[in-house]
Amino acid sequence: MTKTLYITAHPHDERASYSMAAGKAFIESYKEAHPDDEVIHLDLYRENIPQIDADVFSGWGKLQSGSGFEQLSEHEKAKVGRLNELSEQFIAGDKYVFVTPLWNFSFPPVMKAYFDAVAVAGKTFKYTEQGPIGLLTDKKALHIQARGGYYSEGQAAELEMGHRYISIMMQFFGVPEFEGLFIEGHNAEPDKAEEIKQNAIVRAKELGRTF
C-alpha cells in the first residue's frame, strides 16, 4: 500500500488560506483517484515537533556515549523519542505533499523544525568519502505554496527561499521526483484574487489525479 504524508504548515484552514484551499482540493482529488493509498495528515501547527535544543543534544550525546535510552532524563526521552518517531514515519512514506505559505520569503518556522527532525544521517541520507548521499531514492514529493506577490520570475524570484529550500532538501534526501504548485499574485492584484484561487483549485485537482 502506498503511504502519502500530507504535511501542512499553516495556522489557518482552507477558508482563510489559498495554499490550504489548493491543498484540500489536491488531497480530496488524490484520495478519490487513489482509494487504496493510505494518507496521513501531519498538521505541523498541531503536532508535537520538538526543536533541536539542549535536551536533544544532551540526549543524543548520552546515547552516542553508550547510555541506554532509559538512562536519559524525562525531557530528553520525550524529545529524542518524538524526533525518532517523526523520522521513522517520514522514511516509511512513499509520497510527500508539503503545503505552506510564503512568509518573509520562506515558510513558517515549524516547517524548518520538521525538516530538522527528519534530516538524520543514516536514515534519510548518509555520509561517504564522496560526500553525502540521499537514501530516499524511491520517493516523490510535491510542494503547494501560496504567494501573495509574483515570485516565479524577475528580480523577486531570487528572494523566494521557501520552495528552494524544500527543493534542496529533497535533492539532499535523494528524492528523484519533486514539483511545485504555486498560487501567486492574489495580494498584488486583489481584483483577480478569486480567479487566481479557483484556477489553483482546478490545477490542484488535476494534479491530485496523477500524482
Curated annotation (Swiss-Prot):
E.C. number(s) listed in UniProt: 1.6.5.-, 1.7.1.17
InterPro entries referenced in this protein's UniProt entry, alphabetically: Flavodoxin_fold (IPR003680), Flavoprotein-like_sf (IPR029039), FMN-dep_NADH:Q_OxRdtase_AzoR1 (IPR050104), NADH:quinone_OxRdtase_FMN_depd (IPR023048)
Top-level taxon of the source organism: Bacteria
Oxidoreductase as UniProt keyword: yes
Cofactor binding note: Binds 1 FMN per subunit.
GO molecular function: electron transfer activity; FMN binding; oxidoreductase activity, acting on NAD(P)H as acceptor; oxidoreductase activity, acting on NAD(P)H, quinone or similar compound as acceptor
Task performed by this protein: Quinone reductase that provides resistance to thiol-specific stress caused by electrophilic quinones. Also exhibits azoreductase activity. Catalyzes the reductive cleavage of the azo bond in aromatic azo compounds to the corresponding amines.
Family: Belongs to the azoreductase type 1 family.
Protein name listed in UniProt: FMN-dependent NADH:quinone oxidoreductase 2
Organism of origin: Bacillus licheniformis (strain ATCC 14580 / DSM 13 / JCM 2505 / CCUG 7422 / NBRC 12200 / NCIMB 9375 / NCTC 10341 / NRRL NRS-1264 / Gibson 46)
Primary gene name: azoR2
